[in-house]
């Protein structure tokens, strides 16, 4: 297989990958879960245990809005129910250089995405007749300089029971503690069930064939480390899974919100859809907690609302870092991302880090690249003998195949030797592709000049054009031209086909491919010099 045919194989693999990506985006089949059921409840609060099936109507009014802030996010809390109705991520701009924080959670007439939690059950304070109206003095609470954590308690009292809903902010963390401290002085035992859910407008995932993005639910259970559960899945079948530990989440490209309940108890993961209001909720329901008279009880949970920071999320809950979904190429993407991050820490530029990683990858693959060109050179030398066999055996394909295999063995030539570097290069490319789609660290990461966001397409298409030119040069430097006229025409169009597809790819990925082509050209010339000395190659006239 010569270089030009290698390009054709690469193109077929590449286009097949894009077609598969679009098919995955479009099909949205119902997902088979461990257990599915229809939950009859409104979208603000789930039903409690079967024996005490209560639900609460959607809140039509607001309580007082208070603001909580640490060094990475600013939250707005509704004192009616204690829901988180807004989260502004202070270290991430909404748009490139906008200087306006990206708002992940928000509640507007056009779009709802909020984090709700409460206490349901026999003595729950979130009931069909209304939700708990918490009290607190002050409106703004901010983590002070030198302070590592901040606790903000909301207070509600009813029938001799004092409920504190305590929000705990930590420095440098998007992990918000949401705890309940219950003091039962009612004279009799009470029973409550904690829940937490993420309520989101039902929308379709966005993006295109080159850069698909997922917006929808996901969960982790004792049986399933990580699984996406789209809004279409929720509309087809409401989720209901009993599990030890686990978590539920809503993913939005580079960002995620996730409820993490107490990991030491059994929880039920569920979804609720409200077609009338076009919203869906994914949440957890904890076990019944009995609090004897005169006793106190603390119920813990946490809410992650922020970017997909793999290292931090891994410390918050098992498998939460899997929301950075690299697909089947994860085993390549993870070390590549680690290498990218390590080099970026040295050079302080993600574009330079990509160039360095490309050099490392090409250096690792160099022995295979050398073997590829050596195999191709030997195959060219054998062409006269192979043509003679074709003429001698004519239509006897079996005999011709046997004789050719014998010839390959005698000459120590592997006819598939030219394919291996191409086949190894594609998984690396796909792994980098998913890294650019999933790694928030590359969002709005500049290179230089006109490239100010390596996760977005080149605004002036300069890199894709340069990449196409490099492919054309690489093709022209191929030592043996394709003899079949039809195949020749196809090969001549390959650089244009690739350039067209790469117009919409992340500029960082195009940069990788461009640098890879340039290194391949340099390696090719180095290898050819060695082959010329062995008489296996001659310069094209």
From Swiss-Prot:
Keywords, sorted A to Z: Cell inner membrane, Cell membrane, Chaperone, Membrane, Protein transport, Transmembrane, Transmembrane helix, Transport
GO cellular component terms, alphabetically, are:
plasma membrane
Name the NCBIfam families on file.
Answer: PRK01318.1-1 (NF002351), PRK01318.1-3 (NF002352), yidC_nterm (TIGR03593), yidC_oxa1_cterm (TIGR03592)
Q: What is its main location?
A: membrane
- Tell where it localizes: Cell inner membrane
The residue ranges crossing the membrane are 6-26, 337-357, 416-436, 454-474, 495-515
- Explain the purpose of this protein: Required for the insertion and/or proper folding and/or complex formation of integral membrane proteins into the membrane. Involved in integration of membrane proteins that insert both dependently and independently of the Sec translocase complex, as well as at least some lipoproteins. Aids folding of multispanning membrane proteins.
What name has this protein been given in UniProt? Membrane protein insertase YidC
CDD domains linked = 5TM_YidC_Alb3, EcYidC-like_peri
